[in-house]
Design a protein with these regions (language model features):
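Peptidoglycan cell-wall recognition and remodeling modules
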Residues: 8-99
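Membrane-proximal envelope biogenesis segments
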Residues: 1-8
Length: 99
């Protein structure tokens, strides 16, 4: 986890799940994201399904070469833009099996 006073997340060693938890700072939203990415990619940064790639299974070729942390950052921005929260994205996934 981050050291006290650290501000640059690129200098911190953490797993994608730890990074997501740190970024969201909300247990409920984190649990929704864990469910969502568990279904989409099993948190596998090398997962590819058709034109979708990475942990968030985004439709961006950039995700194929992005680090796992950058994939999570990308996914969180996508969720914020499209659904507002990971729980709303999860609810959409439960209805449609995609997000």
């Amino acid at each position: 986890m981050p050291e006290a006073g650290s501000t640059n997340l690129n200098d911190i060693s953490m797993t994608p799940k730890q990074y997501a938890y740190y970024s969201l700072n909300d247990v409920k939203q984190y649990k929704c994201l864990v469910f969502l990415y568990g279904k989409e990619s099993a948190w596998n940064p090398k997962a590819i399904n058709g034109s979708h790639a990475g942990i968030p299974q985004g439709r961006s070729k950039w995700l194929i070469t992005a680090t796992p942390i950058h994939q999570v950052e990308w996914g969180l921005r996508y969720i914020k833009h499209r659904y507002d929260t990971p729980c709303k994205a999860r609810d959409h996934w439960l209805l449609h099996k995609w997000h």
